[in-house]
């Protein structure tokens, strides 16, 4: 049996379950009934147990930016099948299927917007597009966004959710790790703030590159953040990790991230962080102390499993 000809595993995508009553859903985490409108008003977080469901790029941008201020950039960059890669199906067919199912034409949307009073450069990865995997176009769009932030002296925010580097682009996808990291080094030298927001899941080459290079690293509650996931580690070394060892609460306790922020509070917290960072990164200003309660630990969200 060939490497790419094996049977496809049945993968279940976690979503809210529809109940028999119109407009009502059952939370897959706590099994409580919630109304769809209530879920939407709470930024797609369960109002009963605070479980954070995934957001589309469109909804993520709406939740973070002031209304009608987002202006997309570099949307003309499109993926190509440089390697003529075929696994269970040709890479161009995978791309076409992903573009048909998603509101995005690639796994990242970049642009500029306003967050409260601040104009910022914003990048949002899309997990619904091939698992948010980083290929050449994802790396190039992010690099150009970083260069745009450098040119215009805009604070940069990247919201990550990804399975890592894109297998179908092989070494070309791995090259994006170095390219994005090099661009961020120039941004840091120019003293322009970069905030990295990690959502569930953020893994692989994305975790090992730009997602971990923020001046401040923010995470959503109970997010899986790692390089290799628990299943891969278990298959490799034959041992299970301790419960929650790769979740954002564990990483906060061990100094890998700076704070955990619930999604409904994220926009305001980012605005406060930009206020603080702009003052400290400006060459004209003396470093100022952080505002009270700017960064604080939150109680861990208990995992259902």
From Swiss-Prot:
One Gene Ontology biological process: fatty acid biosynthetic process
InterPro entries associated with the record: AcCoA_carboxyl_beta, Acetyl_CoA_COase_Trfase_b_su, ClpP/crotonase-like_dom_sf, COA_CT_N, Znf-ACC
ZnF segments: C4-type: 27-49
Residues binding Zn(2+), per UniProt: 27, 30, 46, 49
GO molecular function: acetyl-CoA carboxylase activity; ATP binding; carboxyl- or carbamoyltransferase activity; zinc ion binding
Catalytic activity entry: N(6)-carboxybiotinyl-L-lysyl-[protein] + acetyl-CoA = N(6)-biotinyl-L-lysyl-[protein] + malonyl-CoA
Keywords tagged on the record: ATP-binding, Cytoplasm, Fatty acid biosynthesis, Fatty acid metabolism, Lipid biosynthesis, Lipid metabolism, Metal-binding, Nucleotide-binding, Transferase, Zinc, Zinc-finger
A single Gene Ontology CC term: acetyl-CoA carboxylase complex
Domain of life: Bacteria
Main subcellular localisation: cytoplasm
PROSITE patterns assigned to the protein according to its UniProt record, in alphabetical order: COA_CT_NTER
Free-text remark on how the cofactor is bound: Binds 1 zinc ion per subunit.
Chain ranges of the CoA carboxyltransferase N-terminal domain: 23-292
Pathway terms, separated by semicolons: Lipid metabolism; malonyl-CoA biosynthesis; malonyl-CoA from acetyl-CoA: step 1/1
One Pfam family it belongs to: Zn_ribbon_ACC
Region (Disordered): 281-305
Matches recorded under SUPFAM superfamilies: ClpP/crotonase
Keyword Ion transport: no
Family as reported in the entry's similarity comment: Belongs to the AccD/PCCB family.
Protein name per its UniProtKB record: Acetyl-coenzyme A carboxylase carboxyl transferase subunit beta
Native organism: Protochlamydia amoebophila (strain UWE25)
Gene, per the UniProt record: accD
């Amino acid at each position: 049996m060939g490497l790419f000809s094996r049977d496809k595993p049945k993968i279940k995508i976690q979503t809210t379950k529809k109940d028999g009553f119109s407009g009502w859903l059952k939370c897959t985490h706590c099994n409580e009934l919630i109304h769809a409108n209530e879920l939407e008003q709470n930024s797609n977080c369960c109002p009963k147990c605070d479980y954070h469901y995934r957001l589309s790029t469109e909804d993520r941008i709406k939740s973070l930016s002031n209304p009608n201020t987002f202006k997309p950039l570099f949307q003309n960059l499109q993926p190509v099948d440089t390697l003529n890669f075929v696994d269970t199906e040709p890479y161009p067919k995978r791309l076409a299927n992903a573009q048909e199912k998603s509101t995005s034409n690639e796994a990242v949307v970049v642009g500029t917007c306003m967050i409260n009073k601040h104009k910022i450069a914003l990048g949002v990865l899309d997990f619904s597009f091939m698992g948010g995997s980083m290929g050449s176009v994802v790396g190039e769009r992010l690099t150009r966004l970083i260069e745009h932030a450098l040119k215009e002296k805009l604070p940069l925010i990247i919201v990550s959710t990804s399975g890592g580097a894109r297998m179908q682009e092989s070494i070309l996808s791995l090259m994006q790790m170095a390219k994005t990291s090099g661009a961020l080094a120039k941004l840091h030298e120019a003293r322009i703030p970069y905030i990295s927001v990690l959502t569930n899941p953020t893994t692989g080459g994305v975790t090992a590159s730009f997602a971990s290079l923020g001046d401040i690293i923010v995470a959503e509650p109970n997010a899986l953040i790692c390089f290799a996931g628990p299943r891969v580690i278990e298959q490799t070394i034959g041992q299970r990790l301790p419960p929650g060892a790769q979740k954002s609460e564990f990483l906060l306790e061990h100094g890998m991230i700076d704070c955990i922020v619930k999604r409904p509070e994220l926009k305001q917290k980012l605005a406060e962080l930009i206020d603080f960072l702009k003052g400290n990164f400006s060459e004209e200003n003396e470093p100022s102390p952080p505002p009270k309660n700017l960064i604080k630990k939150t109680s861990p969200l208990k995992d259902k499993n």
